[in-house]
Regions:
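Acidic/histidine-rich, surface-exposed loop or edge segments in extracytoplasmic proteins
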Residues: 35-51, 79
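General helical structural elements
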Residues: 9-11, 60, 157
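Bacterial N-terminal signal peptides
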Residues: 10-24
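Short, well-ordered secondary-structure micro-motifs
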Residues: 44-46, 89, 121
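Short, solvent-exposed, polar/charged sequence segments at loop or secondary-structure edges
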Residues: 69-110
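C-terminal/domain-edge helix-coil "capping" segments
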Residues: 27-42, 62, 67-74, 97-102, ...
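A short acidic, glycine-rich active-site loop
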Residues: 52-59
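N-terminal secretory signal peptides that target proteins for export/translocation
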Residues: 1-5
């Protein structure tokens, strides 16, 4: 083999090997399942908004899934359960954990939203490392508004918060 050919081959091998150390290129995607979110309304408003809130909370979870999926280093897996919502409260913790494990995901994202007043809502988001049964994130969030835009902004914030908790995992 000629000296030039040997140098080219060595350079190619070095470049390929250096790619293995670039974050995001060598690691498998993080697997996450996002459960449904619970919802409680204690605002005392006269108008029944149950149907609207049910749709918004479902869309909230969908947006969190979409936002996390948009990252190339994250794979969001389906969370299946016999009936919705798929939450620790509606299913019971043992059934919820069993369903979470069936997803094959390493992490499960879950939580709930509480409408406290006409404009103020509080949420709780948790991320559990399923194999280690270790809580990695427990974050309260507060947001103003009871419309699609308020939920969209809250879902974006929650997605960013979860993504930050996953860094280096």
């Amino acid at each position: 083999m000629s000296m030039v050919r040997a140098k080219v081959l060595a350079a190619i091998c070095g470049a390929v090997l250096s790619l293995a150390s670039v974050p995001g290129l060598s690691a498998a995607p993080i697997t996450i399942a996002v459960a449904d979110f619970d919802y409680v309304d204690t605002s005392g408003e006269a108008r029944d908004q149950t149907a609207e809130h049910k749709l918004r909370v479902a869309k909230f979870a969908e947006l969190v899934r979409e936002n996390l999926s948009a990252q190339g280093d994250t794979s969001v897996l389906a969370f299946e359960c016999p009936r919705h919502p798929c939450t620790p409260i509606s299913m019971g913790s043992d059934d919820f954990l069993a369903a979470a494990r069936r997803t094959g995901a390493r992490f499960i994202v879950y939580g709930g939203i509480h409408k406290m007043s006409t404009l103020v809502q509080n949420g709780l988001v948790e991320v559990l490392d399923l194999p280690g049964e270790k809580l990695l994130l427990r974050r309260t969030v507060s947001f103003r508004g009871d419309n699609d835009e308020a939920y969209r902004r809250a879902a974006a914030f929650v997605s960013d918060t979860v993504r930050d908790a996953m860094k280096g995992r």
